[in-house]
Amino acid sequence: MVAITAALVKELRERTAAGMMECKKALVEANGDIELAIDNMRKSGQAKAAKKAGRIAAEGIILAKVSADGKFGVILELNCETDFVAKDAGFKAFGEEVINAALADKITDIDVLKAKFEEQRANLVAKIGENINIRRVAALEGDVLGTYLHGARIGVMVAATGADEELVKHIAMHIAASKPEYVKPEDVPAEVVAREHQIQLDIAIESGKPREIAEKMVEGRMRKFTGEVSLTGQNFVMDPSKTVGDLLKENNADVVNFIRFEVGEGIEKVETDFAAEVAAMSKQS
């Protein structure tokens, strides 16, 4: 039997918005498997939707640049500990230097990039007094590349064909706002589709629907699901009367790939219990 820790219950609560006792019960029934617990809670109606693991917590900036010929682009995340340092001129200048090198030398291996700038990073840490991390880097190549930065916290890069600069920029802005996970509905992995199909089928059957009717209901729900998680299936944020796919078709354009970075995705800050910290310090003194 897996121990059901407070941290596990807390994570499930954050991802489902369900009550503490419901989360603990679901984890016990799932033997500590949080993904299974979420699936079971969705089937029973306790959780209509589950958030992805990892709160947006770390600070830093996203940078994105495209080569002069417009065929190669790099997007980068540089982390620090506080919002104050994220706005620091020295921190930003370091980020510019790193992304310029990644672009010029086509460095897409994060370990290679980190090694190249380790000495400068260490010097900046000593100067600023905060830990700094070149967290991730990614690149795209294509006929038409476009980028969009929402402040410095969200960055998007899009590779397209048959599109002009303005269209690619609008698509990138849509991606920043709507967070698609795939380019087209058919790109959604079979295992993701199968898992969602089973959840929706169980929900329909448990609501009292005969299996045959439940299957037909789920077909419609699955079309909606794959559309919602894919770029071309989503309603375009600037004109919800059409999908992004419709917009691309109107312009004889296509999106080959995209990358969306948001500062701190998947990183959770350690929360300090101030009262416990004071109590611990008083015991030491």
Curated annotation (Swiss-Prot):
The domain of life for this entry's organism is Bacteria
- Region Involved in Mg(2+) ion dislocation from EF-Tu: list its residue ranges: 82-85
Where does it live in the cell?
A: Cytoplasm
User: Which PROSITE patterns does the record match to this protein?
Assistant: EF_TS_2 (PS01127)
**Does the record carry tRNA-binding as a key word?**
no
Query: Its GO CC terms?
Result: cytoplasm
- Chief subcellular location equals cytoplasm
- Which Cys-Cys disulphide bridges does the record give? none
Functional note? Associates with the EF-Tu.GDP complex and induces the exchange of GDP to GTP. It remains bound to the aminoacyl-tRNA.EF-Tu.GTP complex up to the GTP hydrolysis stage on the ribosome.
Q: Identify this protein by name.
A: Elongation factor Ts
Name the source organism: Yersinia enterocolitica serotype O:8 / biotype 1B (strain NCTC 13174 / 8081)
The root-end lineage is: Bacteria, Pseudomonadati, Pseudomonadota, Gammaproteobacteria, Enterobacterales
